[in-house]
């Protein structure tokens, strides 16, 4: 088997005066022999001189073989290899995007991890709370919950990873919840306990009684 042979490359410091290529597999030559045909062959409006690559020399020779009266030229090769083309420069990079379902699952798993981490911190905080701070609030009024905007609160929220411009912190009779703009609810099991009043009402609710039995007469006839 023959080994791979790397072709020899020829280089020019100033580059080809037509296409501006600075390297070629063929030698560069002086452009004096072809300068008189540059205007018609390449559609140039200025005089160019210097080195010329073999590819541009072949284009000049091909132009000379065109039939008389032909207006064909190779203006598109002028300065074509001066640098990266505009198309290459402005071409946006392809970014691998995940599907919507995969992104959503990743966000959910990340949220669950944050919940676990913050729940462990919240549990150690709530376990040492005084009885007055228990989840059963007996002194609250009947007109609902004490709603606080999380962005306006001075204390640091337990869930520091939440978007405070979207979630509202609400203190209800069963504890503390975070409510979203569209009705979503986030609950921390360490800060949310069943309401004492609901338990008491369920215990005091009389059991449903069936129909009273008809009295049995004991009189002898």
UniProtKB/Swiss-Prot annotation:
Residues 124-135 have a biased composition (Low complexity). InterPro entries: FAM60A. Residues 112-152, 201-221 are annotated as: Disordered. It is found in: Nucleus. Pfam families: FAM60A. The keyword Nucleus applies. The keyword Nucleus applies. Keywords: Nucleus. Residues 136-152 have a biased composition (Polar residues). Residues 112-121 have a biased composition (Basic and acidic residues). It comes from the Eukaryota. Its main location: nucleus. One of its GO terms (biological process) is negative regulation of cell migration. Belongs to the SINHCAF family. Component of the Sin3/HDAC corepressor complex at least composed of BRMS1, BRMS1L, ING2, SAP30, SAP30L, HDAC1. Found in a complex composed of at least SINHCAF, SIN3A, HDAC1, SAP30, RBBP4, OGT and TET1. Interacts with SIN3A and OGT. Subunit of the Sin3 deacetylase complex (Sin3/HDAC), this subunit is important for the repression of genes encoding components of the TGF-beta signaling pathway. Core component of a SIN3A complex (composed of at least SINHCAF, SIN3A, HDAC1, SAP30, RBBP4, OGT and TET1) present in embryonic stem (ES) cells. Promotes the stability of SIN3A and its presence on chromatin and is crucial for maintaining the potential of ES cells to proliferate rapidly, while ensuring a short G1-phase of the cell cycle, thereby preventing premature lineage priming. This is SIN3-HDAC complex-associated factor. It comes from Pongo abelii (Sumatran orangutan). The lineage of its organism: Eukaryota, Metazoa, Chordata, Craniata, Vertebrata. The gene is SINHCAF.
